[in-house]
């Protein structure tokens, strides 16, 4: 999976289509990602030492990685990602602009 934690992405399909956010977590075994502020669900939590109140909380649920596209930092437009080798290292790049991305 070419999307990494901290990348800016835009949701391209589903109930949250059009929303943008930062990737908080990548679950590569299931090809899913957690995006900040996207796919919010309500979860009932029991009281714990950390949260003595308990109750209903809003959390971000994972969405499939195919439902998001990386946002090119130079143009702020969705783009596909590619990988090429430079000096024996893998370098990610935006396919629309051709610019390298810091890993």
UniProtKB/Swiss-Prot annotation:
Spans through the membrane: none
Region (Disordered): 70-103
InterPro entries in the record: KOW, Rib_uL2_dom2, Ribosomal_uL24, Ribosomal_uL24_CS, Ribosomal_uL24_KOW, Translation_prot_SH3-like_sf
Xref: Pfam families: KOW, ribosomal_L24
Quaternary context: Part of the 50S ribosomal subunit.
NCBIfam families: rplX_bact
Protein's name in the database: Large ribosomal subunit protein uL24
Species: Lactiplantibacillus plantarum (strain ATCC BAA-793 / NCIMB 8826 / WCFS1)
Lineage: Bacteria, Bacillati, Bacillota, Bacilli, Lactobacillales
